Amino acid sequence: MSCETEDLEILKGKTFSRVIRWESTPFLYKAITAITKAGPVVVTATGHGVPDGWRVAIVSAGGMREINAKYSPPRPSEFHRAKKLSSDTLELNEVNSAGFTTYTSGGYVQYYTPVDLSGYSARMTIRDQVGGTSLLSLTTVVENGRIVLDNTAKTITLTISATDTALVTWSEGVYDLEMVSSGGVVTEILAGTITALDEVTT
């Protein structure tokens, strides 16, 4: 997938934390065997393989047409953040299916492939402008430790401590997050602007 764009905010004097999930093609499909009529909805798909917190779309489910993505491939707004209840069940907290038509059969949980993070390191630089002066860096290097990779959960966690954000003197910048493979291949996966706001409570 191409680099995603997201604008971030830091509150000075507060801990900044953001969890990134690196998605890639191809899509994966897991057959559905049951969908509850409840809020939140629970979907059963044996051995779904979906990491907790991953985005999923429901497609081609029989009976409960209301839950299906309308477009193929699904649009970003048709994906829902999934809570992994077990290896066979997922909860979609955003979806209340209590008033939907009863599920009959078929359908798939569709989701992007989670990238294998083994062998990767990560780095993120905040600059005053594109190609400008570095304001702050985040890396997976132990001495820095502001980025943590979890290949089991398939997460990339960015953290800036409250102590460090309190020292921020700039108000706005730009950033990019790069993943570096063991072979030295660099992939930019996220970029955007970042704003540092003054805290209200000290």
Put a short name on every predicted segment.
Residues 28-115, 128:
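Small/polar beta-strand repeat architecture
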Residues 1-28, 112-202:
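Contiguous segments within soluble domain cores/interaction surfaces
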